Amino acid sequence: MSLFWELLYLFKRTPWDTGLTPPEIVAMVESGKVPIGRALDLGCGTGTNAIYLAQQGFEVVGIDVSRRAIALARQKVRSAQLADRVRLERGDVTLMRRYAIGHSLEQSPFPGGIDFAFDIGCFHNLNTEARRRYVSALTTVLKPGAIYMLYAFEPQADRRGVALDEIAVLFDPAYRLDALRRGSDRHGRGSAWYTLIKREAC
């Protein structure tokens, strides 16, 4: 799978890499619902959103499977003079615990966990078992009350996606769905923004 993404970045077949932070992320940050703290960018690509959050005062860990994407992201972070606020890791998002908090919270660069996590188009590419591992790891690294935003395509007959009922099964009972905004891409494929909040007891 990682070779697939390397080739897309090599040949610049990356229409999602717009260089712009989605207005949904900007609105969440500007709303004040997320405390300025620690953020996790899952499937960070070339770092656009990690850089935006660092500019707003967050400490950020970004994870992506593509070496080329991470190399480009590191260049952008250095150019923005934000290397002290953004840590970029090439790896498997289902192993996010390793990158976000280390082997234990006591050893963590982010002791106490993550305040805000988001995923723009990574989760929907995972298979069912990987999605389970992802949610388990996410629940470990997020603080109680943390906000998680997910942008995902809806499933089609020949393409992976994420349906609302799957969100309910995978994320319950550790999370509650706070908001759902449906839409579509420029080709008319259905998509949605999910905003979930980790329950205090989980």
What do these predicted regions represent?
Residues 115:
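Conserved acidic residues
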Residues 121-125:
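Short catalytic micro-motifs in class I SAM-dependent methyltransferases
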